[in-house]
Amino acid sequence: MHVRGHFREMFMSKTLSTKGSVTMKNLNGTSDKNCKCGSWLDHWKTFAKASSTPKCHVAGCNSSAEVGAHVILPKLDDESFRKLNYIAPMCKSHNGQPDTEFKSKPDSFFVSANKALTCGA
């Protein structure tokens, strides 16, 4: 899967957009993490510059996102990006399946979960 932008720019970037669908994997044990945005869904909306609540990023799901899920993208071409944590909007049903891999909707937008790069909390 190709990622738009160059490695250095993306590594230090707050966001990542993909061409087509990518594999996302829910991270386990992240529910106690927080940031100053109020919620991880608000974190995603802030840095994605989204004014309304998005749909769940899981392909085939039409539910509204209820949470900002912590995910990795384990099958990206660039190994350096595979280990980075991202926030993806998800419904609670999909987010409640830790360590599960899902296909994202085409051309999804992910926001870094690295608070030092984003909200500074």
Predicted stretch roles:
Residues 87-92:
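Zinc-coordinating Cys/His ligand positions in small cysteine/histidine-rich zinc-finger domains
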Residues 41-67:
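Short cysteine-rich loop/turn motifs with clustered Cys
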Residues 78-84, 97-121:
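Polybasic, low-complexity binding patches
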Residues 6-38:
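A boundary/linker detector
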Residues 31-48, 69-77:
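Short Cys/His-rich Zn2+-coordinating modules
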Residues 62-86:
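Histidine-centered nuclease catalytic patch
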Residues 37, 56, 66, 84-85, ...:
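N-terminal helicase ATP-binding lobe
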Residues 2-4:
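Acidic/polar hotspots within intrinsically disordered regions
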